[in-house]
């Protein structure tokens, strides 16, 4: 069908799969057909970019190909007000194992998957799995500096001492202070809606202060003025 050929060629040109002067009436060879099909399969113009990818453009650097899906899936879990504040504040996320290894050598702390540098406004990641934990560090500092809770660090020191061993999540096993506890709790909460790792455990009937704290933040839109 000549009309079909013309319509098809026009679409191919729009997608960049054929040259602007290509003639739809010419018979193409099998090799040319294979070339066009391959271009169509690998063409990215036809695929709509996910909103979370568009939103984070210019924020994420050196994201490994193998981590793309996991990274954006977790970033989408971060409440939108926090993501927007992160971007507006000029923060960046860099996948930089060299930077992390240098820090490990200087500090003597090894096995680090992520770091949050407030002075640089940068989160450094070795793997995507640390994203939510590090975003928790950013958010806790934001809570303090915006005046939502200027005592959030001391508050979570107290909460950690009460809750660490009664079922609240502590995935890193490095909760030496309230900040690490907060970051772990944030990561678990935005993923599951709870901070308790085992809601059916022995503390199931206990009222966890950390749960109430995050429930209030979520109910008020995460970033607000007192």
What are these regions (language model features)?
Residues 1-51:
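N-terminal propeptides
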Residues 51-226:
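Active-site-flanking segments in enzyme catalytic domains
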